[in-house]
Amino acid sequence: MAESLMDIKRRIASTKKTGQITSAMQMVSGAKLSQIEKNSVAYQVYTDKIREIVTHLAASQLIDIARQKSSLQAEPADSTIKKAIKHEVTLSNLLVERPIKKTGYLVITSDRGLVGAYNSSILKAMVQMISETHQSPDEYAILAVGGTGADFFKARGMNLTYEYRGVSDVPSFEEVKQIIKTAVAMYDNGVYDELYVCYNHHVNSLTSGFRAEKMLPITDLDVSEVADQNLEYITEPSVDDALDAILPQYAESLIYGAMLDSKTAEHAASMAAMKSATDNANNLISELSIKYNRARQAQITTEITEIVGGAAALE
């Protein structure tokens, strides 16, 4: 049954309203993206500097000395999550690789939809990675940041150890500090033996890609980065005290940097999704307008024909 002119007009009006909403949401996402990109650039300066300091220590063999001392002093880790989370992270646990009995995954997703394939790409990659790597839920622990991921893992009966919802659109370190410290403390307490942060990495406004970065233990320092620099250090009060202060900050900075990157990708995905929705609304309005004009033209033609026919009948 053909649509009436009134039905077409209602669809045009409804689509225009939807397009206005998605256009406004696109602009909001664009503003959030711009803000978090500025924050990310500023934070990268801090991350680069603390990495440089830690790499200097590695190149000057201070970390190697501490690692050797720590490996002799390290005690078996308590693997129960019920143990009270420490506030002081053990230096030996951050530096020394141990047998991998359990892997931790800090998975970052959004709390809401309307972000295109942002969440689905992360969750699909996580399911594939876990199924290929682990034989049972006892071999991994999931820490979910974002309601979408938490609900997904719960619905599938996967080993969800920790969840956090409600991260703001432009998170500060103070806001997410407890998430980061909890993840590091769980590793320190032996809840898992290595920690990966899994998220969508922001490439540009149109592109992002899944990443699973190993954050703990700290083993990815490349001393060649500072090979041509002066590496003589005078440490006060001791090497261990310096590393006790710097290494937890370094680990936390890596995780926070990943969270900023993930939020940047989320806003970019939201902006792209809303732009696509707005474009689709505009295209649909154009199609409906053409359809309306044709229907109106046909109606006018019919009316003229009826008038002419009626006039001819009266002659």
Curated annotation (Swiss-Prot):
GO molecular function: ATP binding; proton-transporting ATP synthase activity, rotational mechanism
KW GTP-binding (keyword) present: no
Membrane topology qualifier: Peripheral membrane protein
UniProt KW Aminoacyl-tRNA synthetase keyword: no
Domain of life: Bacteria
One GO-annotated biological process of the protein: proton motive force-driven plasma membrane ATP synthesis
SUPFAM superfamilies, sorted: ATP synthase (F1-ATPase), gamma subunit
Keywords attached to this entry: ATP synthesis, Cell membrane, CF(1), Hydrogen ion transport, Ion transport, Membrane, Transport
Signal sequence interval, chain numbering: none
Subcellular localization, as worded in the UniProt entry: Cell membrane
Any Gene Ontology CC annotation: proton-transporting ATP synthase complex
Function: Produces ATP from ADP in the presence of a proton gradient across the membrane. The gamma chain is believed to be important in regulating ATPase activity and the flow of protons through the CF(0) complex.
Family as reported in the entry's similarity comment: Belongs to the ATPase gamma chain family.
Complex formation: F-type ATPases have 2 components, CF(1) - the catalytic core - and CF(0) - the membrane proton channel. CF(1) has five subunits: alpha(3), beta(3), gamma(1), delta(1), epsilon(1). CF(0) has three main subunits: a, b and c.
UniProt name for this protein: ATP synthase gamma chain
Organism (species): Latilactobacillus sakei subsp. sakei (strain 23K)
